[in-house]
Amino acid sequence: MEAYTEKIREAAQRLLKENKVDLVMGFQRGTIPMMSQPVLIRKANEGERLHWDSHCGSNLANYLPKRKERIAVVAKGCDSRNIVVQILENQIRREQLYIIGVPCLGMIDRRQVLGALQGREPLSVSETNAHLVIQGKGFEEKLERSLFLQDNCAICIHRNPVLFDELVAEPVPEQTEVDRYEDVKGIEKMTADERWQYFRELLGPCIRCYACRNACPMCYCPTCFVDESTPQWLGKSIDPTDTTTFHFLRAYHLAGRCTDCGNCQRVCPVGINMRQLNKKLEKEIKERYGYETGRSIEQRPPLDTYRPDDAQQFFK
Amino acid sequence: MQNPYLPYPVRIDTITVETEDRNLKTFKFVFLNPEDEKRFTYKAGQFAELSVTGKGEIPIGIASSPTEKGYLLFTVNKVGVVTTALHQMSPGDIMGVRGPLGNWYPWEILEGRNVVIVGGGFAFTTLRSSIVYMLHPDNRKRFGDITVIYGARTPGMLLYKEELMAWERRDDIKMHITVDATKDPSWKYHVGFVPTVTKDTAPSSENAYALVCGPPIMIKFTLPVLTGLGFPPERIITSLEMRMKCGIGMCGRCNIGTEYVCKDGPVFTLAQLSQLPAEY
Amino acid sequence: MYVNPADGIPRMAKRAFKKAALIDVLNRLKERYRLYAPVRQNDMTNYQELASGDQADFSASNTRLSPKSFMHPQSLCMFAFGTDKGSDQAGILREVEKDLPRSVVFGIRPCDSKAFQLVDVNFNTPEYQDPWWIRRRQSTTLVGMACNSPCSTCFCTSVGSGPFSPDGLDVLLTDLGDDVVAEVMTAWGSEVLDHADIRGRATDAMTEKATALQQEAERSLGSLLPTESLREKNLNALFNAPFWDDVQFACINCGVCTFVCPTCWCFDVQDEVRNQQGVRVRNWDACMYPLFTHHGSGHNPRHQKLQRVRQRFMHKLKYFVDKYDRGVACVGCGRCVQQCPVNIDIRQLFRLMNDFKG
């Protein structure tokens, strides 16, 4: 990880010094263990602020839409695929970007680690290739890194950036023996009533803070459908029907555009795994159209493009 | 404990279309309960929240003067959900009025002073309230010279046209009515932007206060003119707009710095505003 | 009996009960009051109405969500109305009856109790009184639990509270291990303890141990965040300070900080209609959201993220300070520090704003 940090700093300093970009978006160390803070630097001597570790789970593509500057952005595999879709959707131009690609071995799920510590507070966390070493008041724990990855990282099959201008390390081997849809298939087997109950419970704790929407790099609408008033599509209280509507509709708006970066689940203050909705639609898109989001800048997302041989009758 | 969120029920008595684009209508409301009217004692400059059940509430300046008894007047611009619903209502319909809210033009301080009123567009509503109040026989001698500069984009966009003409004919108030542009050959008043007309007519700042109400662009260009005429910041008074919901300083959304526009305002002097962030 | 010079309220003799009897205490309270306590839900703890005393879990340093929903529910139906124009009730709003029996929030932390006192200044003013907040305040007893081990993101002592602060509490409990000391702060607290059959007196040894725990807890919070210069800073100078640009970048305007914060109270009012019936409901809102200050005309004074991020911290650490002279609108609970997904740390803002030279 130190090697990554060095490379990112070197790239940032070089790009700013040579005036190849106006600003660099990366991460700086967080103020509490297992967190880092997205940072924007404009001067080469700020390069020292940049840092990389297994707690850089935020998707920096979230900060790109509609910016006008020349931007160097640090991107993991998932982030780079979001950037591809943002370029296709005219939210940012390829020429503006210098993508510092980071082959990623997965980000740590901070809440899972806190859960494992059972109320003991971590005061410092360091990592080796295979372990997290956690120190607190009167204890030290060594946890196996691979058991504490974010849910989406555990089943990631696109860890290497697909679009980049330079890589900070050699590409990492992609995971091949993962079933991305194991939990989705479990839900598919339920009866309609069971499924209704399942989603009621899943979304029950939602407090409609919209952090999931705000953290999503693909949710960039100037006025989100939940904020429209003429017409008003759904109520703003925590009524369960309105809450379910919000999550279902948002998932549909992301069909074919979501890269499972996991940001939504990561930011949710009450830990809702709304990614299950997105993965169901990801599975559908893959089965119907053979498409995986953002793999290539040559391929448009299936729901924003029309082919004469598309199955739907009403198109004709 | 009186519930400050509960509006007084009122009936729509008349609806007058004010402007040629039909986007501004003046509503005359009559209280259903006479005791509510007694509770609704207000001063010129205040506003109320107009409540349309099923749609919501909107903060609108009170256009009637406290001297006009038995009804309230509000001039409403159609911009969104609530105002559209209100525009579609008819005389006889019931809705709600919550208030009076906010502070008012500083009438105690204005006693014995000359008053210069500068208004633009449909921000003129509380200025109408102020003019009717001052011109009332009980009140007129409490104030010095009254000068009014009021403009709209075209003659058809002026509010309260008949009253404007009536005031124009009076000799105890000096009216300067203007429009930005017009092709109407019968237009006999000024043509020009409000800030320009203010500069040209140059009302004296001696012993005078200026009440300024208008769209942000008008205010922006009028304030330097007034300053140039010698009005110090403490004697330039304006009424601000903000997005509001509760109207009573609790929902937290209408603040400029430390001040809630709905409760500590909407009337502020320029001197007060200069102490606050320019975030409005 | 002695008088605490800070609040002038005589602090009554301390009672005590065995920790092992805690579940019985809760069950007895449950018979008389609507009882809420922290309950573990997977990896987080939140307040729930107890079905039985053994559900309570006081092991977490604090709950994920603050207890502000007790006084300020996230969604509250204010009024009901019919939309049938032909009816004689057309256009008339009726206040919705609320069922507010006497409630006890058991195990609330001192920071969250102080937060209610700070938010009181918003909802209970000389000119207007919010009936829903006030009725809930009046019907809810707060039995606080002192914090023996504050966590590293707590900073209550920097903002006028403390791990053992009695501000706003009816009872302050201290967990000594085998015993629990119960200090009565109000007549209501006394009544609740009577109903829980807690009548034993705390011994001197217990009182000494509680004091020692308090000192240790306060010491563990380390050095204070700087707040002494916030009042005197020029408001516009702080507003126009250059550091906002750097602070605001990471923010995603997600609203989590606002929703978990015990001193955030902003709300929205909406009418919702279904068929011929409707309600006027108020919901939590956040100055973080772009449409918070959006005018009907389309004008938005805070259309940029920087303006919104600045508003949050200027309000909490400056506007509230100037307006009410009660210190900052923050009780140091640390929830925003723990929950902000991009690690925007309000403690840094204390330093940036207090130490700003401009």
Question: What is each residue range found by the language model?
Answer:
Chain C
Residues M1-N234:
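Iron-sulfur-associated redox domains of electron-transfer enzymes in respiratory
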Residues A21-V25, C257, N283, D345:
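General structural feature for long, well-ordered alpha-helical segments within catalytic domains
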Residues F106, P242, D246-I252, V256-F259:
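Short, well-structured alpha-helical interface segments that form or flank functional binding sites
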Residues F116, P262-C266, P341:
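Active-site-flanking alpha-helical
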Residues A187, V256, P262-V269, F292:
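Histidine- and/or cysteine-centered catalytic micro-motif in compact active-site loops
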Residues S229-N234, C254-P262:
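Oxyanion-binding "anion nests"
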